[in-house]
Design a protein with these regions (language model features):
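Secretory targeting and sorting signals
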Residues: 2-38
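Acidic, glycine-rich low-complexity segments
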Residues: 37-380
Length: 380
């Protein structure tokens, strides 16, 4: 995932700044596997609950019972990281405050499941697998609860639940389930073939080069898929699959299977790109924005010969092409297609009307915006 990704000029999805409010005790569970400096080993209890050595923790003590490690947040903005102990992958550390120090330690072999509930407040919780992967063998669910939460997944089958609030969910490299909940959420699946249920609100799902083929359910609200291209030539195709949108990128053999997504933003970036928008009737997509700028957030083209192809239907179509120096718009079909930052010297917009008695009206397109073709014939 990029450090910063522009979302409609205002919002960003970024790696979480993560750490759960306050300092808790260091405890050993499931044996005497190491101690914190200045402390003795904690007693081992049959219910595997961690012993508390200090009392000033805002995050409730993690509880390990019957193989489930349960971590409950507070009504404040909590910060938490989970990681394996460096040099000793048999120990799972709970870092309250995400300050790099372990506040609780548990024998990894005793854990079959992890559940984190951030509670109220704007929480930041992340899976830190820099010392090794553990979510591939331990089922892990991280819930933000109420508040604007920042949740980061891992390399295994992690479930991230935003809950209420405008949340940021960032998956890891694994095959994850990302649940936005209520609020306007920003969701980035990152690696792996993820499933995102974006929930209520006006949500945005972000895809970057290197990510997997994902399933998106926009659900309620006006939702956006933001797909960032790479610096080289790409071939992208948008088509209807029943009531679902199939967004295919040839490079990497990426297929995005979406429903309930009303807007698609594609940042083509560098290279001679080909973007084909087929008839999207039956889907929820009403707007497709294709940005031909050479950089994210830029206003200048990439200097390459880009092609945008818009295919009509087999019925009688009335298509309009409008625009000025900054953009061209194709309307009259199921989805309005906006071509942003075209270069008249390099880029071309092709309209294929297919069967039926069709009309293409380009009277609203200013000169010098983009090369326009209708059924292979250049239009002045």
């Amino acid at each position: 995932m990029r450090n910063f990704i522009r979302l409609h000029g205002s919002r960003v999805v970024r790696p979480a700044l993560l750490a759960v409010s306050a300092v808790a005790a260091i405890a050993i569970v499931g044996g005497t596997a190491g101690t914190a400096a200045g402390y003795g080993t904690a007693p081992v209890h049959h219910d595997h609950n961690a012993s508390r050595l200090r009392t000033e923790a805002a995050f409730d003590d993690p509880q390990l019972a019957h193989g489930e490690l349960a971590i409950e947040g507070t009504n404040a903005g909590d910060r938490l990281a989970l990681r394996l102990q460096s040099g000793n992958p048999a120990i799972l550390q709970v870092d309250v405050g995400d300050d790099g120090s372990a506040d609780f330690r548990f024998a990894r072999a005793e854990i079959a499941k992890i559940s984190v509930n951030g509670g109220n407040g704007d929480d930041a919780v992340r899976i830190d697998e820099s010392n090794g992967v553990f979510t591939d063998t331990i089922s892990t669910t991280v819930g933000g609860g109420n508040g604007d939460d920042n949740l980061v997944g891992g390399a295994g089958a992690v479930t991230l639940e935003g809950g209420n609030g405008d949340d940021i969910l960032a998956g890891g490299s694994g095959v994850e389930t990302l649940l936005g909940g209520n609020g306007s959420d920003s969701i980035d699946g990152n690696g792996g073939n993820d499933v995102a249920l974006m929930g209520n609100g006006n949500d945005t799902f972000v895809w970057d080069p290197g990510d997997g083929s994902d399933v998106l359910e926009g659900q309620n609200g006006t939702d956006t898929m933001l797909f960032n291209g790479a610096g080289g030539p790409e071939q992208v195709d948008l088509s209807a699959n029943g009531s679902r949108l199939r967004f295919f990128r040839a490079q990497g053999n990426i297929t995005m299977d979406t429903a309930g997504v009303e807007r698609v933003d594609f940042n083509a970036l560098g290279g001679a790109d080909l973007v084909t928008v087929n008839d999207l009737s039956g889907t929820d997509v009403g707007n497709v924005n294709i940005d031909l700028a050479g950089t994210l957030g830029g206003s200048n083209g990439d200097g390459a010969a880009d092609r945008v192809v818009v295919n009509g239907t087999n019925g009688d179509d009335t298509i309009r092409v409008d625009g000025d120096a900054g953009a061209a718009k194709v309307s009259g079909l199921a989805a309005t297609v906006n071509v942003l930052h075209p270069e008249a010297a390099n880029d071309r917009l092709e309209i294929n009307t297919l069967a039926g008695k069709d009309t293409v009206n380009a009277g609203g397109l200013a000169a010098g915006v983009i090369k326009l073709f209708a059924n292979g014939v250049p239009l002045p």
